[in-house]
Amino acid sequence: RKNIIKKLKDIIIGQDDEIDQLVTEIFRLQNNQNGKNKGILLSGSTGVGKSRICTLLAKYLDIPCKIIDTTQLTMPGYRGQNIEDFLEQLYLDERKNLKRVEKAIIVFDEVDKKGSRDNYDVSGKGVLNQLLKFLDGTEYTIGLNEESVLQKTKVRISTNNMIVIFSGAFSNVYNAPKFTTNNLGFRETNAPKSKEPTLQDFIDIGCLPDESMGRLPIIIHLNTLSENDLKNILLHSKESDIYYVKQEFKNEAEADIKFSDEAIEEIAHQAYLLQTGARSLQKIVHDATYHAFKKVTDDFGKYSKVIITKDTITDHKNYTLIPKEQNKVLQKNKKML
């Protein structure tokens, strides 16, 4: 367990306590033999890592993970996809290994949107009640089209031993006056936390059905990322976009790329202003390096280094190139000194 926690923290920044709690709860649920109290409510704003944590955790545990967009779920008889469709996809993805499928982590993502007042119609309420049935443990029958036979092959899939996570931003809950810590409604990791919402608050404010009470005993809220968190993601995460860009320049142009400290700070600042968490980092880094990448690949072998400064983040053509010959002279002079 400690090894898995460390691996997650090497990638996901700003959620140390929350990772500890989630991994511990998952281990407890896996060892739970009575099939009760296995629902987790995982909340957090856009881009804080809800889906990524779940997929990585499943990878490290060597179990399947299926993330289902709850907004796309419909009741039988309505146009759209139902739970059986997603279970069929999972079954085929796992090469029809039923034992693995029935041990999977199932994430019902954006469940708050399905339960919002705008969508809380007969269909929306029906879908949420279906999810609670899924959580309680039931069986679904999926039909597979087999090439060798004219009729569908029926497969029964039990959810009794699946780990079920309800995921969403639930911004209407966390932006409620009694839970906000500043006038913007965002909570930074270094800000003092007010009282945490209870499941009753999610029912009253977040439009979860009353039947949720008692079924989601574990509530984990991922922190909204601060500007410093975003900077640390760039500098320290093993999935940092800067790391990938450095590899790209090295592999495709045989050139090093260096970001000044001020450039890192500006990228984090621009991403923070967008309030979409870590998701915006990739686009900002990509846009800031696009013209430099095009130049060094067009003139392959000519340049040894690219320097990205704070000015490059706002003016993407404003970067510095170090030719290979000049770099050789600089290295020679250093040795002489």
Where are these regions (language model features)?
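AAA+ P-loop NTPase nucleotide-binding core of proteostasis motors
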Residues: 1-337
